[in-house]
């Protein structure tokens, strides 16, 4: 299935690229999320008419993400207070939702999907470096402190 990308998609292409993807990926993910349209003659003509508008919207999203990344960089640390047991082990764990809620409580809106924890949830008291991916091209590392209650 050939599609035209309406926004930048990681490891696939940028706005306006005509790419070949598996039918299921195009039908079930790219098209419903508004990231692409099927590459038919009429859609290609419609896209060319809207190209400048779509590129401007993509640029605006990136600029907004860079602004949020700057706010995250200005804030030195984010702290989460959690209940702990013996030897600094947490009761439960700290996951992406907890981190996103802590950052949002400090005034910077972040969704849980933007928080990247490649090693999985955090289960001990301490300092951690966590990546926040605000846009395909914009990632900001933050310092997260998990303290005992």
Swiss-Prot record:
Concerning its family, UniProt says: Belongs to the bacterial ribosomal protein bL9 family.
**Coiled-coil regions listed:** none
- Record keywords: rRNA processing included? no
Please report the name of this protein according to its UniProt entry.
Answer: Large ribosomal subunit protein bL9
Q: A single Gene Ontology molecular function, please?
A: structural constituent of ribosome
Mind listing the GO biological process terms from this record? translation
Protein's job: Binds to the 23S rRNA.
Q: Specify one Pfam family.
A: Ribosomal_L9_C
| Record-linked PANTHER family | 50S RIBOSOMAL PROTEIN L9
* Native species: Teredinibacter turnerae (strain ATCC 39867 / T7901)
Q: Which UniProt keywords apply?
A: Ribonucleoprotein, Ribosomal protein, RNA-binding, rRNA-binding
What InterPro entries does the database record attribute to this sequence? Ribosomal_bL9, Ribosomal_bL9/RNase_H1_N, Ribosomal_bL9_bac/chp, Ribosomal_bL9_C, Ribosomal_bL9_C_sf, Ribosomal_bL9_N, Ribosomal_bL9_N_sf
Show the PROSITE patterns listed in the entry.
RIBOSOMAL_L9 (PS00651)
Query: One cellular component GO annotation, for this chain's record?
Result: ribonucleoprotein complex
